[in-house]
Swiss-Prot record:
<dbReference type="GO" id="GO:0051484">
    <property type="term" value="P:isopentenyl diphosphate biosynthetic process, methylerythritol 4-phosphate pathway involved in terpenoid biosynthetic process"/>
</dbReference>
<dbReference type="InterPro" id="IPR026877">
    <property type="entry name" value="DXPR_C"/>
</dbReference>
<feature type="binding site">
    <location>
        <position position="53"/>
    </location>
    <ligand>
        <name>NADPH</name>
    </ligand>
</feature>
<feature type="binding site">
    <location>
        <position position="162"/>
    </location>
    <ligand>
        <name>Mn(2+)</name>
    </ligand>
</feature>
<comment type="pathway">
    <text>Isoprenoid biosynthesis; isopentenyl diphosphate biosynthesis via DXP pathway; isopentenyl diphosphate from 1-deoxy-D-xylulose 5-phosphate: step 1/6.</text>
</comment>
<feature type="binding site">
    <location>
        <position position="138"/>
    </location>
    <ligand>
        <name>NADPH</name>
    </ligand>
</feature>
<feature type="binding site">
    <location>
        <position position="28"/>
    </location>
    <ligand>
        <name>NADPH</name>
    </ligand>
</feature>
<dbReference type="GO" id="GO:0030604">
    <property type="term" value="F:1-deoxy-D-xylulose-5-phosphate reductoisomerase activity"/>
</dbReference>
<dbReference type="GO" id="GO:0070402">
    <property type="term" value="F:NADPH binding"/>
</dbReference>
<dbReference type="Pfam" id="PF02670">
    <property type="entry name" value="DXP_reductoisom"/>
</dbReference>
<feature type="binding site">
    <location>
        <position position="27"/>
    </location>
    <ligand>
        <name>NADPH</name>
    </ligand>
</feature>
<feature type="binding site">
    <location>
        <position position="233"/>
    </location>
    <ligand>
        <name>1-deoxy-D-xylulose 5-phosphate</name>
    </ligand>
</feature>
<feature type="binding site">
    <location>
        <position position="25"/>
    </location>
    <ligand>
        <name>NADPH</name>
    </ligand>
</feature>
<comment type="similarity">
    <text>Belongs to the DXR family.</text>
</comment>
<feature type="binding site">
    <location>
        <position position="211"/>
    </location>
    <ligand>
        <name>1-deoxy-D-xylulose 5-phosphate</name>
    </ligand>
</feature>
<protein>
    <recommendedName>
        <fullName>1-deoxy-D-xylulose 5-phosphate reductoisomerase</fullName>
        <ecNumber>1.1.1.267</ecNumber>
    </recommendedName>
</protein>
<dbReference type="GO" id="GO:0030145">
    <property type="term" value="F:manganese ion binding"/>
</dbReference>
Length: 407
């Protein structure tokens, strides 16, 4: 049985829902807290976590009267306790405290801890059988098969919080799995959609951070510019909805109004539309199986006027093609894809490589890892973390060579 409910059975959510937000001070966390703020009568905050932002975490804890808060940096525990002195709010720090936050008895958990660090706390929430709004990519990209198996066995409900996957989740409710022919994930095309390949190669950090539609964190904005984020989303969709690579298409849609579509066997295509605002998919997750009042601007199609679509250009944006290759290779290759991309993006931000070298480093790392015969099924979180570490080391070792080729 899938942990993602493809048919949205209408079981009314009654009473006050207890919620925990892992990654409360990040961009996804900000959107989540904004929605909670708008409906205080519906939600009780159980636990909140942050990476290092003690001031922001303490402010939210006081505002929402959280019962437990945790900061990932152990050195910040005394600072957190001082900020919450006299409140009676329990405090923790370090990786174990983040896991403890996930283990606390909340009905609904937003899993928005970035990176591989989010895997273990998200699994802790899954193991309780909670409703988990999944915003952490690594759970699926690095550990998709066993993550979804574990969620199904625990009776957890996985609610996709990413805009594209949430769109597919909503559209898939219009039919049965055996009636599906393919899903279509939309991509804005990013800031370099119309740029020539030579110009993309030389793009600066400031240019890569100028996304035309979405307001996001630095890493995901750069991933959008390279279309690596769309590659990650293809991988995620495969595990979330049990799809083969051939059942997942990507189309460039510059207006970012249609977020995802599903084609069924009768050739009907069901699409989900909305303003480009992360509060819309998060609101869907927060209210599911019901709907709550959203905070995004209403969609005005007459004002938008035109919706356009283009095929993705794999030559100018090779990162998307590499995602399909990693998905077909299996046995940890998607973990390598993600890890190498993170190393490459960090190097680009540090001005150690050109923008165009991001995909080349990912490709070379994947090739080297496969040539070394490292492929093996991943059966637990520690397996995924080990492959992640190995791939990061391999990418770091290849970095000078890639940088030299581009200079």
């Amino acid at each position: 049985m899938s942990a993602v409910p493809l048919r949205n059975a209408k079981v009314a959510a009654s009473g006050v829902r207890s919620v925990s937000v892992l990654g409360a001070t990040g961009s996804i966390g900000d959107s989540t807290m904004d929605l909670l703020r708008a409906s205080p009568e519906r939600y009780q905050v159980e636990a909140l976590t942050a990476n290092t932002n003690v001031a922001g975490l303490a402010k939210l804890a006081r505002e929402f009267n959280a019962r437990f808060v945790a900061v990932a940096d152990p050195a910040r525990l005394s600072e957190l306790r001082a900020a919450l002195a006299g409140t009676g709010i329990a405090c923790g720090a370090g990786d174990s405290a983040i896991v403890e936050a996930a283990e606390r008895p909340a009905d609904w958990v937003m899993a928005a801890v970035a990176g591989a660090a989010g895997l273990k706390p998200t699994l802790a929430a899954v193991d309780r059988g909670a409703h988990v709004a999944l915003a952490n990519k690594e759970c699926l990209v690095c550990a998709g098969e066993f993550f979804m198996d574990r969620a199904a066995k625990a009776g957890a409900t996985i609610l996709p919080a990413d805009s594209e996957h949430n769109a597919l989740f909503q559209a898939l409710a219009s039919g049965n799995r055996d009636e599906l022919t393919k899903v279509i994930i939309t991509a804005s095309g990013g800031p370099f959609r119309t740029w020539a390949a030579a110009d993309i190669e030389q793009a600066t950090l400031a240019q890569a951070l100028k996304h035309p539609n979405w307001s996001m964190g630095q890493k995901i904005t750069i991933d959008s510019a390279s279309m690596m984020n769309k590659g990650l989303e293809v991988i995620e969709a495969s595990w979330l909805f049990a799809l083969s690579p051939d059942e997942i298409d990507v189309v460039v849609h510059p207006q970012s109004i249609i977020h995802g579509m599903v084609e069924f066997s009768d050739r009907s295509v069901v699409a989900q539309l909305g303003s480009p605002d992360m509060r819309t998919p998060i609101a869907h997750c927060l209210g599911w199986p019901d709907r709550i009042v959203g905070r995004a601007a209403p969609l005005d199609l007459a004002k938008i006027g035109t919706l356009t679509f283009e095929a993705p250009d794999y030559a100018r944006f090779p990162g998307l093609k590499l995602a399909y290759e990693a998905l077909r290779a299996g046995n940890g290759a998607t973990t390598v894809y993600n890890a190498a991309n993170e190393v490459a993006v960090a190097a680009f931000i540090a001005q150690r490589i050109r923008f165009g070298a991001i995909a080349r480093l990912v490709e070379e790392t994947m090739s080297s890892w496969i040539r070394a015969g490292n492929q093996a099924p991943l059966s637990c979180a520690d397996d995924a973390i080990a492959v992640d570490h190995s791939a990061r080391n391999m990418a770091a070792a290849l970095l000078p060579q890639i940088a030299a080729k581009a200079s």
